């Protein structure tokens, strides 16, 4: 089975060491452009752009990189409860049109109540998933060309519609990750690809089976993806030295402070990530070649595959055998590691070819919208 491999744009910072200013790098637009163009040239299918108050805005970053890339797809965040689904659908269609079908969307419910409150979202975990389900229903229908009336507990719209459709038909794919039962229910019912953070193959297998069964009960099928860091070198010994060097400047206080901050999250996925290492720097290899050191101070994806190219490829195949077809990778620093992954790992993988959609007629020349209501149609000649 061919696999899709994405890279990552570090809009929240980059460097040679975790939790330290030593070896840090200025992450400005020129640097992000370098990474995006490298990923484009090296054969990555797309890039994940992170979201949250610690990051640059993912939509603006993606839009700015469209003209300087050719085939690279952009996986950007949808934030239910922070933006209306109708506006989000219009923005999604615009990004898809501007990029000629290179837009992908990642539904992010959020897991930090403190950050969400700062955004104006004051819902508990259960309510956020209720709102996310309603948001996604409206967003999908509007993008698919329907005129939507919807009266839910959290979302109410009347006459929501889209005048300018996306390039991808019926709409761009929707990605989503979450480990709670509510998250799995949402994935089974409404998304195209369910993402998991890099847990052990046994844990990932269990999650896939649960989501697959829930989707089947609704008459649907769901694709699967995984989010991991990668530390690949010419030898496995060298790769492990690089992993240990990445956390060489971490002290116990920095780790404890980070884990205390993560403890306030109500994200089940973040809790599962934290349980893999317990806040300790010893015994970080939690499964063969799967290292939990990144999660000592980094929220979200906290594990890395470590080894030489053939070894890492073997571990990737183990996940692929579970049904995963999309791998979202990253590494520190992200520019150099993109090249290492391409040179040392890609030769051992069966990579999917990036296919771009042909332009739909709706993206061709048209007259100005009449009274902000409809697009004038070409009159047929009799």
Curated annotation (Swiss-Prot):
EC number: 1.14.14.5
Catalysed reactions, semicolon-separated: an alkanesulfonate + FMNH2 + O2 = an aldehyde + FMN + sulfite + H2O + 2 H(+)
Keywords, comma-separated and alphabetical: Flavoprotein, FMN, Monooxygenase, Oxidoreductase
InterPro entries for this protein: Alkanesulphonate_mOase_FMN-dep, Luciferase-like_dom, Luciferase-like_sf, SsuD_RutA_monooxygenase
One Gene Ontology molecular-function label: alkanesulfonate monooxygenase activity
Manganese in keyword set: no
One GO term (biological process): alkanesulfonate catabolic process
Top EC class of this enzyme: oxidoreductase
Presence of keyword Transmembrane: no
Gene3D superfamilies: Luciferase-like domain
Assigned protein family: Belongs to the SsuD family.
Additional remark text: FMNH(2) which is absolutely required for this enzymatic reaction, is provided by SsuE.
Subunit structure: Homotetramer.
Function summary: Catalyzes the desulfonation of aliphatic sulfonates.
Protein name: Alkanesulfonate monooxygenase
Species classification: Bacteria, Pseudomonadati, Pseudomonadota, Gammaproteobacteria, Enterobacterales
Gene responsible for this protein: ssuD
């Amino acid at each position: 089975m061919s696999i899709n491999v994405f890279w990552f744009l570090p809009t929240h910072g980059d460097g040679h060491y975790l939790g330290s200013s030593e070896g840090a790098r200025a992450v400005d637009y020129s640097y992000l452009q370098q990474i995006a163009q490298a990923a484009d040239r090296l054969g990555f299918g797309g890039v994940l752009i992170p979201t949250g108050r610690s990051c640059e805005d993912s939509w603006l970053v993606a839009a700015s990189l469209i003209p300087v890339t050719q085939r690279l797809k952009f996986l950007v965040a949808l934030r239910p409860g922070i933006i209306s689904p109708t506006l989000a659908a219009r923005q999604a269609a615009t990004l898809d049109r501007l990029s000629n079908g290179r837009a992908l969307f990642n539904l992010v419910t959020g897991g930090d109540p403190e950050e969400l409150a700062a955004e104006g979202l004051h819902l508990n975990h259960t309510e956020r998933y209720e709102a996310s389900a309603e948001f996604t229903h409206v967003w999908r229908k509007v993008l698919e060309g329907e005129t939507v009336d919807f009266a839910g507990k959290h979302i109410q719209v009347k006459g929501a519609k889209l005048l300018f459709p996306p390039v991808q038909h019926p709409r761009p794919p929707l990605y989503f990750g979450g480990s709670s039962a509510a998250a799995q229910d949402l994935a089974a019912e409404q998304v195209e690809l369910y993402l998991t953070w890099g847990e052990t193959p046994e844990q990932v297998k269990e999650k896939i089976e649960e989501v697959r069964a829930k989707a089947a009960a609704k008459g649907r099928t769901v694709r699967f993806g995984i989010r991991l860091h990668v530390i690949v070198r010419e030898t496995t010994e060298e790769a492990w030295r690089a992993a240990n060097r990445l956390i060489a400047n971490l002290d116990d206080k920095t780790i404890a402070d980070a884990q205390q901050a993560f403890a306030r999250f109500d994200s089940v996925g973040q809790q599962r990530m934290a349980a893999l290492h317990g806040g300790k720097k010893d015994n970080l290899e939690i499964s063969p070649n799967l290292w939990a050191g990144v999660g000592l101070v980094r929220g979200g994806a906290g594990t890395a595959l470590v080894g030489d190219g053939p070894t890492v490829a073997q571990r990737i195949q183990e996940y692929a055998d579970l049904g995963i077809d999309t791998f979202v990778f990253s590494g520190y620093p992200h520019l150099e590691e993109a090249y290492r992954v391409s040179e040392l790992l890609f030769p051992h993988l069966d990579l999917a070819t990036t296919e771009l959609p042909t332009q739909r007629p709706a993206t061709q020349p048209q007259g100005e919208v009449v009274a902000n209501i409809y697009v004038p149609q070409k009159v047929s000649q009799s």
